[in-house]
Swiss-Prot record:
Name of the protein in its database record: C4-dicarboxylate transport protein 1
Species the sequence originates in: Mesorhizobium japonicum (strain LMG 29417 / CECT 9101 / MAFF 303099)
SUPFAM superfamilies linked: Proton glutamate symport protein
Transmembrane intervals: 21-39, 59-76, 89-111, 162-179, 200-221, 231-253, 342-364, 368-387
Domain of life, per lineage: Bacteria
Membrane topology: Multi-pass membrane protein
Length: 477
């Protein structure tokens, strides 16, 4: 007769508060603000810390995307799923990117953050924005699409272009699936290679507090908190609009699809704080992909949706573009008719696609939009150049949440979301720290729920018990 486990089973050791990654990043951000404010020269000199961390993360992004996408697609029994997932993802991206643009227009017209400033265009330093405007003129729809195709396979990985790596990874995954039995050894090798690569991601994430500290100290030291005061209405309106979009629009989408936006944000809090510190949603891409897979979304869906979303689903950038354009028009007393605003919306829908998830890309995209919309003066961008960095954090945070929601929603539409695993992950039954270095491969639907670690109210399993009870880790504990 089997006897139940006694409540006296040894409890798993709990982390102290400061040992939690998100607490370390939060403390680092606060220290960075303090150093940048009180010692601005030192703060500016700490910029290499943030730059070095972002470069370290970019170093691993291409291998993570390649391994995740190629193994996910190669493991599909039906290759038509690739087209379905991509199609559903694009429908989602276009729908909610357009909604973000519309929300920015509506809030901008209601609050009118630039009204009453009466800025004279001749008094603005247009030289400050010439560099961004020249970059904007280099962008075109045809050029963007052609740039998705790498010149060489090696070149895509060397340059670290997300869309080029994704393009090759999809083709390679399809080819690997088509060769059948003879490709299984290659697939097995790539699956084995995933373990050390994600372990490396965990190691790199341990440096996140240092990177966040350096980046925040530089931002405050160079631009100063006081620079926000003059344009506080614009910054405040943008943050309010992003808040309404995340908790209103995306919150409703989450509820309709069976989960809570609050639970999702709590689940990805480490990634959000990392983005807050670095102002770049790209810094959290590897760990976000790992988190979404742990939450029950199939690897093939996560690998397609999130990297693609970093170019096609930038909700924060979309809100920023329409709101900033309206602010410039209002501040310079430029009247925008309904037709002008519709043109602004249509142009922004195109120019926002392909905006990279790196710091400052939103400003270049705004320049590209205004250069096509003659009613809004491009020179007016000089007004917001000083506070753009402070809005960059909010753009990146909104982009990150939007892509996290997209991956779960598209996975659910495709029937590739394990609801039991999602609930368990949101409740903390699976390791949430990306620094653990032990990513889960999405389990098969037949046994995914059964393999979850169970935790009763009166006791918890030891780490060894968990390792013995779960076969889904890529590397043993």
């Amino acid at each position: 007769m089997l006897t139940p486990l006694a409540p006296s089973v040894k409890r798993a050791p709990r982390k102290t508060l400061f040992a939690k990654p998100y607490v370390q990043v939060l403390v680092a951000i606060l220290l960075g603000v303090a150093v940048g404010h009180f010692y601005p020269q030192i703060g500016e000199n700490l910029k290499p810390l943030g730059d070095a961390f972002i470069k370290l993360v970019k170093m691993i992004i291409a291998p993570v995307i390649f391994l995740t996408v190629s193994t996910g697609i190669a493991g599909m029994s039906d290759l038509q799923k690739v087209g379905r997932v991509a199609g559903k993802a694009m429908v989602y991206f276009v729908t909610f990117s357009t909604l973000a643009l519309i929300v920015g227009l509506i809030v901008g017209n209601v609050i009118q953050p630039g009204a009453g400033l009466n800025i004279d265009l001749t008094s603005l330093d247009v030289q400050a924005v010439n560099g961004y405007a020249s970059k904007a003129h280099e962008q075109s729809v045809t050029g963007f699409l052609m740039n998705m195709i790498p010149t060489t396979i090696v070149g895509a990985f060397v340059e670290g272009d997300i869309l080029q790596v994704l393009f090759f990874s999809v083709l390679f995954g399809i080819a690997l699936a088509m060769v059948g039995e003879s490709g299984k050894s290659v697939l097995s090798f790539l699956q084995d290679l995933t373990a050390p690569v994600f372990k490396l991601v965990g190691i790199l994430m341990k440096a996140a507090p240092i990177g966040a500290f350096g980046a925040m100290a530089f931002t405050i030291g160079k631009y100063g908190i006081g620079s926000v005061a003059n344009l506080a209405m614009l910054v405040g309106t943008f943050y309010l609009t992003a808040f309404l979009f995340v908790f209103g629009v995306l919150g409703a989408v989450c509820r309709y699809n069976g989960f809570s936006i609050f639970s999702l944000i709590r689940y990805i809090k480490e990634e959000l704080l990392l983005v807050l510190g670095t102002s770049s949603s790209e810094a959290a891409l590897p760990s976000l992909m790992e988190k979404m897979e742990k939450a029950g979304a199939k690897r093939s869906v996560v690998g397609l949706v999130i990297p693609t979303g970093y170019s096609f689903n930038l909700d924060g950038t979309n809100i920023y573009m329409t709101l900033a354009a309206l602010f410039i028009a209002q501040a310079t007393n430029t009247d925008l008719s309904v037709g002008d605003q519709v043109l602004l919306l249509l142009v922004a829908m195109l120019s926002s696609k392909g905006a990279a998830g790196v710091t400052g890309a939103g400003f270049v995209t705004l320049a590209a939009t205004l250069s096509v919309v003659p009613a809004v003066p491009v020179a007016g961008m000089a007004l917001i150049l000083g506070v753009d960095r402070f809005m960059s954090e909010c753009r990146a945070l909104t982009n990150l949440v939007g892509n996290a929601v997209a991956s779960l929603v598209v996975a659910r539409w495709e029937g590739e979301l394990d609801q039991a695993q999602l609930k368990a992950a949101f409740c903390g039954h699976q390791p949430a720290e990306t620094s653990a270095g032990q990513p889960l491969i999405t389990p098969a639907p037949s046994n995914s729920a059964a393999s979850l670690p169970v935790e009763s109210p009166g006791w918890s399993q030891t780490p060894d018990d968990r390792a013995a009870g779960s076969k889904q880790t890529l590397a043993g504990r």
